[in-house]
Amino acid sequence: IFRQQAAIAGLAMKVDSAGTGDWHIGHAPDVRAQRHAKAHGYNINKLVARQVSADDFRKFDLILAMDAQNLADLQDIKDSISDTDGKLAKLALFSEEDPTYGGDDVPDPYQGDADAFEEVIERIESSAQAWIESWKTA
C-alpha cells in the first residue's frame, strides 16, 4: 500500500515490509488481507513475509513500526548493532505523522473479523499518505 502510494506521489524510494517475529516467514499475506487490499486497488498476493534483519538498519533510512511493541523490538535490534558511522535507520511509529491517528498503534487484524481488516487498510492508507505529505513539504 505504501509502495503504491509513494509511486503515485512521484516519490522514488525503496519500500519493504518485514516482521519482527519469525512465525510467518515465507508465507503470503492472509487471504482476508489480500481480499481487502484488492478491494482498495492494491495487489499484495505476491508479497512474501520475511523477518527484519540487521542489514535493514543499514539499507533503509527509516523503519516504521505498526505498534509500540514492535517499535520496542526494533529498538532492541538496533541497539545490538554496532553503529560506528551513525548511519543506522531511524525508527518511528507508522501512524506518527497522521493527524487522524496521532501515533496510535495499528491494530493486528488477524484475530478479528472482516471489519478489522478493513479498518487496518484504511489506517495504513491514511498514515502512509501522512508520511508522504510530510516528505513532500519538508
Where are these regions (language model features)?
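Small/polar loops that bind or transfer phosphate-bearing groups
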Residues: 17, 65-66
